């Protein structure tokens, strides 16, 4: 009878070990996925910063062209 109890206990211990092993593998996969996503976020933030700089530059250029256009229109009205 104690052999049966020992075998049941051994089976439960083995099941626990298997579960722990699977969970450790899942943790490693999730860590890798997390690192990958963190890199994607960093890349997206960098791209956003570049686009914001480009947008500001284009706004400045547009403002400059509008000023030139207003100056030309002012000269045309004088003529």
From Swiss-Prot:
Bias kind Basic and acidic residues: ranges: 46-57
An individual GO BP term: FtsZ-dependent cytokinesis
Coiled coil segments of this chain: 3-79
Alphabetical list of Gene3D superfamilies matching this protein: 1.20.5.340
Record's subcellular location: Cytoplasm
Gene Ontology cellular component terms for the protein in this record: cytoplasm
Keywords for this protein: Cell cycle, Cell division, Coiled coil, Cytoplasm, Septation
Major localisation: cytoplasm
Ranges annotated as biased composition (Polar residues): 36-45
Region (Disordered): 36-64
InterPro entries with a match to the protein in the record: Cell_div_ZapB (IPR009252)
Family in the record: Belongs to the ZapB family.
Function statement: Non-essential, abundant cell division factor that is required for proper Z-ring formation. It is recruited early to the divisome by direct interaction with FtsZ, stimulating Z-ring assembly and thereby promoting cell division earlier in the cell cycle. Its recruitment to the Z-ring requires functional FtsA or ZipA.
Oligomer status and interactors: Homodimer. The ends of the coiled-coil dimer bind to each other, forming polymers. Interacts with FtsZ.
The protein's name: Cell division protein ZapB
Organism: Salmonella arizonae (strain ATCC BAA-731 / CDC346-86 / RSK2980)
Lineage: Bacteria, Pseudomonadati, Pseudomonadota, Gammaproteobacteria, Enterobacterales
């Amino acid at each position: 009878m104690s052999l049966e109890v020992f075998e049941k206990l051994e089976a439960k211990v083995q099941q626990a070990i298997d579960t722990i092993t699977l969970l450790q593998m899942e943790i490693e996969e999730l860590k890798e996925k997390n690192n990958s996503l963190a890199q994607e976020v960093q890349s997206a933030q960098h791209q956003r910063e570049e686009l914001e700089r480009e947008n500001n530059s284009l706004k400045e250029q547009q403002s400059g062209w509008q000023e030139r256009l207003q100056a030309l229109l002012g000269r045309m009205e004088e003529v």
